[in-house]
Amino acid sequence: MRNLTKTSLLLAGLCTAAQMVFVTHASAEESIEYDHTYQTPSYIIEKSPQKPVQNTTQKESLFSYLDKHQTQFKLKGNANSHFRVSKTIKDPKTKQTFFKLTEVYKGIPIYGFEQAVAMKENKQVKSFFGKVHPQIKDVSVTPSISEKKAIHTARRELEASIGKIEYLDGEPKGELYIYPHDGEYDLAYLVRLSTSEPEPGYWHYFIDAKNGKVIESFNAIHEAAGTGIGVSGDEKSFDVTEQNGRFYLADETRGKGINTFDAKNLNETLFTLLSQLIGYTGKEIVSGTSVFNEPAAVDAHANAQAVYDYYSKTFGRDSFDQNGARITSTVHVGKQWNNAAWNGVQMVYGDGDGSKFKPLSGSLDIVAHEITHAVTQYSAGLLYQGEPGALNESISDIMGAMADRDDWEIGEDVYTPGIAGDSLRSLEDPSKQGNPDHYSNRYTGTEDYGGVHINSSIHNKAAYLLAEGGVHHGVQVEGIGREASEQIYYRALTYYVTASTDFSMMKQAAIEAANDLYGEGSKQSASVEKAYEAVGIL
C-alpha cells in the first residue's frame, strides 16, 4: 500500500481509492503532498502566494521561498547551502520563470533529488515540485579512490556479467554523488558505460568512493525493440540536398540539419564506438536523381523530419535540445540487428531479423518515441527506474502516438510482420498485450527496473482517456482532444517534471500545466483529474 499525506484547502478527512491513501488537513495558504518515505513535500501548490520582498532579484525571492519551507523540508541552515539552480527557463506565454534545482550536500549533488519551482512575473512562487531529502548527517565528501579507479571497477564488473568488452561506446566518466540507498548514504562515483556488444546497454554503476565496491548497477538504455509490420512501401516526400547533379539525404532547412546515413551493416559495437569518439555516421546516401531506393533510409529521413516538424509546429521546440541540434540517423546498423535506439549522439536503426522485426526506421511512432527520450533527457531528466522510469517510457509513447496520430497503437507498422493488427503497445487498451491499465494492478517487482515498460501502460491509459474520454473503472472522463492533451503533457514535461517525479506527482504536474494553459477550474483541468482518477492515480 502506498501512503501519502496531503494538505488541502478544501477538506479534512481520509479517503481511499485503489491502493492509495491520502490524509488531508485544512490550510488556507497552500496544498502540499508529502512523500511517504521522507515525509517532506513532493509538491506545494500556493493558494495565496507569499508577497515578495521589494527590490529583490528572482533568485533572491526563490531562495527566500525555500528558506520559508526549510522546516517542512527537514533541512538545517540556509537554503542556498542545500539547493543549486541548474537551469532557468523563461516562459513567454505566461511570463513565468521556471527554476530547475538540484539538492546538494556539502556541494555534492544527492542522486535523484531534483526540483522545479514556478515563479510568477511579480516574483511570487506559484508551485514547487520534486522530492526533497531531509538533512543528511556526517557523510564525508572526500573520495578515497580516484575516478579512474572507479571506471576500471565498473568495467571489470560489467565484463564479469556480459563478457569481454572489446570497445566502449564513448569515453566513460565518473561523477560524484551522495547516493541514498537502503537507509545508507554513500559518497559514490556514478560511472556510465555504453556498449553495443556483447550486449547493448547504457550501464550505470555506483562505485563507493571510499572502498571501491559496487553499491548498485542497472542498465538504462532507451530502445524500441520490436514494433510494427515493417517498412510499408508507401511513397514519402522529404527534403534533400542537391549538389553538382547528385542528391543527398541531407536536409539543411530544419534546425542545424537532419542527415541520414548508411552503416553498411557495420558491427553495431564498432559503429557506435566510432560514432561516439570521432563522430562517424556511416556512408552518405547518394542518388543520381531525386528518387531514393533505400526504403529504410527513406523512412528514417522522412520520419525524423516529421518528428522535428511535430515538435516545432506543435510546441515551438527547435529539435530535441531546443537549440536546433542536428538530428542524425544511421540505418543498416549491424546484421539483422533487432533494435533501434537513441545513443546520446544520434539515432541508430537495425534491419531486424525479418521475423520478429523489419527495419525499425519504418515506424513513425518508434522514431518519435526515441527522439522524445532525447527531449526528456534535455528537459526533465527522468530517472530510468520505478515510476519515474515508467513515466519516461510513457511520455515517449504518448508523444509517439501524437506524432503518428492515426491510432493509439505503438509500433504497429514494423512489429511481427505477417500478423495483422499486431502492435507493441496500445494506449487505448493496454490489456491487449497483457499490461496493466489501473494502479491497483501495477507491477511491484524488481524486473525491468521496477516495471518501467510494464507500468508505463497505466499512465498511457490515463493519457488516452484524457484525449478521447470514456468510462474506466466506473469513472466517467470527458475527453478534451489530442490537441489540448499534448499541450498539457509537453508543458508538464518541460516545466514541472523532475528526475524523481512519480505517478502522483505527474498527475499534479499535469493539473498545473492545464491550469497554466486553460485556467484554474477549466474543463481541461477537471478532465485531467478524472483521467488519473480513472486509472487509480490520486
Curated annotation (Swiss-Prot):
Pfam family, one: PepSY
UniProt cofactor note: Binds 1 zinc ion per subunit.
Activity profile over pH: Optimum pH is 6.6.
Position of the signal peptide: 1-28
Alphabetical list of InterPro entries matching this protein: FTP_domain, PepSY, Peptidase_M4, Peptidase_M4/M1_CTD_sf, Peptidase_M4_C_domain, Peptidase_M4_domain, Zinc_Metalloprotease_M4
Cofactor dependence: Zn(2+)
UniProt-annotated binding residues for Ca(2+) 1: D365, D404, D407, E409, E412
Propeptide segments, given as residue ranges: 29-223
Active site positions: E370, H453
Positions bound to Ca(2+) 2: D404, D406, D407, E412
Chain residue ranges for the region called Disordered: 421-441
Family: Belongs to the peptidase M4 family.
Protein name: Neutral protease B
Lineage of source species: Bacteria, Bacillati, Bacillota, Bacilli, Bacillales
